[in-house]
């Protein structure tokens, strides 16, 4: 962020339920942690700060919120960058053995409360380390300060429940919202780790995303070499180069 902040005004937020953000009730349909609700949060933050139009960069769950933000608030999103994700509905529609093993947590996290909550509570930090360690370069990709921030958040049972509600929404109400058929209308950069799960997808990620845009030409992208899921941590120079070229001066 420091490098981007040298050229741009950077607003970095924790999604609702994550980090130090509030953890509001979810509701029976998990709508409180839907990407639509989270996108509305981000739009509200930017309005409060006085930014009517803006570019958005998101990674992982943040990228899914970025996608929904660009759909629900298309008039405000000038351009967006999606880091290391495939569309949620695409993932669920293309599950095979390899994907199920790599993304096992998607199917564990969506189980009804409080089964995942209780199981993770047995040793949350161990589970966090195993989860982070299974992606890309493993725990070595994260410096001590970043890992401590993950651990602090994950030690909070309410934060873990909020995270699980996010995934439960992803398997339910978020898919209903996707079925509404809105399409991306802003220039979209798709970046993925060459060595990660997204990078190993049989269909190139840009080919997956282009049908979800009003004009397929809006979607461009590239693999980040020598990187898995955590692009910034594993290859900052290449990720930053792609982002700065896309975002402009």
What are these regions (language model features)?
Residues 227:
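Conserved short acidic donor-positioning loop in nucleotide-sugar-dependent glycosyltransferases
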Residues 11, 18-57, 61-223, 232, ...:
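Flexible "cap/lid" subdomain of the alpha/beta-hydrolase fold that forms the substrate-access gate
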Residues 1-9:
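Short amphipathic alpha-helix adjacent to the substrate-entry channel of hydrolases
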């Amino acid at each position: 962020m420091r490098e981007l902040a040298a050229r741009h005004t950077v607003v970095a937020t924790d999604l609702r339920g994550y980090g130090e953000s509030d953890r509001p009730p979810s509701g029976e349909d998990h709508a409180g942690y839907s990407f639509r609700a989270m996108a509305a949060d981000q739009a509200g933050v930017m309005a409060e700060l006085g930014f009517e139009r803006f570019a958005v960069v998101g990674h992982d769950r943040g990228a899914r919120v970025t996608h929904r933000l660009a759909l629900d608030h298309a008039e405000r999103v000038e351009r967006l960058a999606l880091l290391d994700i495939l569309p949620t509905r695409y993932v669920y529609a293309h599950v095979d053995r390899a994907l199920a093993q790599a993304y096992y947590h998607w199917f564990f996290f969506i189980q009804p409360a409080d089964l995942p909550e209780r199981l993770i509570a047995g040793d949350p930090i161990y589970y966090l380390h195993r989860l982070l360690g299974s992606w890309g370069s493993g725990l070595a990709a994260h410096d001590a300060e970043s890992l401590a921030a993950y651990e602090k958040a994950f030690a909070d049972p309410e934060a873990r429940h909020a995270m699980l509600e996010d995934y439960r929404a992803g398997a339910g109400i978020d898919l209903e919202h996707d079925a509404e058929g809105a399409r991306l209308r802003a220039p979209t950069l798709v970046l993925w780790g060459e060595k990660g799960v997204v990078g190993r997808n049989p269909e190139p990620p840009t080919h997956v995303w282009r049908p979800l845009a009003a004009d397929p030409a809006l979607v461009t992208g590239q693999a980040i070499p020598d990187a898995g899921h955590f692009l910034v941590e594993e290859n900052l120079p290449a990720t930053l180069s792609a982002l700065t070229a896309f975002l402009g001066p």
